[in-house]
Amino acid sequence: GLWSTIKQKGKEAAIAAAKAAGQAALNAASEAL
């Protein structure tokens, strides 16, 4: 149903945000070195 679709989209968005944050952290670390 609609609610499961919303939850799935939220989960995907959270995963994408976590990946982006991790990549940003790696970039910042490599800049600092």
Swiss-Prot record:
Expression across tissues is: Expressed by the skin glands.
- Give a GO biological-process term: defense response to bacterium
> Keyword Secreted, does the record have it?
yes
- GO annotations of cellular component type: extracellular region
Localization recorded for this chain is: Secreted
Residue(s) carrying Leucine amide: 33
Would you indicate the residue range of the signal peptide?
A: none
DNA-binding as a keyword of this entry, yes or no, is no
Q: Which UniProt keywords apply?
A: Amidation, Amphibian defense peptide, Antibiotic, Antimicrobial, Secreted
Q: What does this protein do?
A: Has antimicrobial activity.
Question: What's this protein's family per the entry?
Answer: Belongs to the frog skin active peptide (FSAP) family. Dermaseptin subfamily.
- Protein name, UniProt field: Dermaseptin-H9
Q: What is the lineage of its organism?
A: Eukaryota, Metazoa, Chordata, Craniata, Vertebrata
